[in-house]
Amino acid sequence: MKSIVKKMTSLLLLIFVFIGLVGCQKVDDNAAESPSQEASSEENSGADKEASEATLNNKAEFEQLKEGEDFHIGLVTSTVSQGEDEFRGAEAAIEKYGKASEGGIIVNDTYPDRFEAEIETTISKIKAMADDPLMKAIIVNQSVPGTTAAFTEIRKSRPDILLVNLTPQEDILMTSNVSDLVVDADNISRGYRMVLAAKKMGAKKFAHITFPRHMAIETLAIRRAIMEEACKDLDMEFVSLNAPDPTTDIGVPGAQQYLAENIGPWIEKYGKDTAFFTTNDALTEPLLRGVAAGGAIFVEPDLPSPIMGYPSAFSIGLDDIAGDWPAILKIVEEVVIEKGGKDRMGTWAYSLGYTSTIAAVDLVVDVLNGKADITNLDDIKKAFEAQTDGASWAVSNMINMENGEELKNYALVAQDTYVFGKGYLGMTEEEVDEKYRKINVNVEDMVEKQKESEGKFE
């Protein structure tokens, strides 16, 4: 089920690191089509196996901190424009633990907005964290392409550093193999629960808006397949739509303009009782405005949060209450209801990107002090719930589709859906049929299928 494109791209990145060429070798969006990847299937299989074996169970050899021992934690996140919540989560961690340069423990950096075209920069920024002799853990959120290669190199030079991968965008097994902990949104259960939530909110159709690059991300491709299957089971119509990829030359403004111009006609075509969903953060803002104006349905963002798209879509000022999630939710709810979204628009009450960032820091601090286990699901849940008073979380392990076994260091998290004007839907209590956890996809086929969907993707 692994994507050949994703696996080969990750392997090439690992090879560049191993031979010391990361600093000079250009890696671009067309790397998957380079001649070096046209080797025989037998050679590819052998290289694949070798890379997997080289990283399997290659976990941190860290020691518990001594009382009063100085240490640092590295945080690499998206920028405000690509993922504000993760960035704000890093700011919260700095506020709580202090900057390393000012006597605290947090060393913070961001990867480029056009990370697909600047993979080398991402790798170098993550690797640079390990140059700090006091560094004990490195957390990346979101873990964009290049994270696996950087973690692999860090493990070779600094086996004592804990490596935490949040919201990964690379191959599941490779990500698991090079990380001490991986945490991602439970896109398996959410694939079903979001469609069920949409039906509870009155939807008769579910429209999935994305672009081919995102369908090359295994977890997103699986979730899309689950959503389509859930629509069949719940007697709803599944609609596949394209929008431009903001990381391409069209940029964020161009992609947002396209969606803003097309959401109205799509609502007119498919009807107000259609739930619209996009896999991209930057596209969320125009989608929310369009859904509210057209009276359609929006269950929750891809990376759910009351500040994911809502403030910018509806000009909501929240600077004076940043980090106060109950207060943020209250203000956003009032504005959304005023805009016509009562009972038709939702979110998670607390941001996934924000919560996962600060919760991961808290967890790592406890692990380094011998108070928690990095892969213990109860400890992970405790760290998340400590940041989200009143909201329930479901935490489980990712399943390795190749052998049906759980990946013990790969945690999936899900928070209950909050509908404005109605409250929590109780979605974390909804049982998800085991068949959805076993749905397999051919990622290459999914990419081609997306290219054939309605709309422009570049």
Annotated model-derived regions:
Residues 22-33:
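Bacterial lipoprotein signal-peptidase II cleavage site
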Residues 50-123, 139-145:
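Extracytoplasmic "Venus flytrap"
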Residues 51-58, 331-458:
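Hinge/cleft segment of the Venus flytrap/periplasmic-binding protein
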Residues 54-61, 181-207, 258, 328-332, ...:
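Hydrophobic alpha-helical segments within soluble ligand-binding/sensing domains
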Residues 73-77, 132-144, 161-166, 207-209, ...:
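Periplasmic-binding protein-like
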Residues 90, 187-240, 364:
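An alpha-beta-alpha
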Residues 153-185:
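Flexible loop/hinge segments that line or gate small-molecule binding clefts
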Residues 231-238, 285-369:
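Extracellular/periplasmic periplasmic-binding protein-like sensory domains
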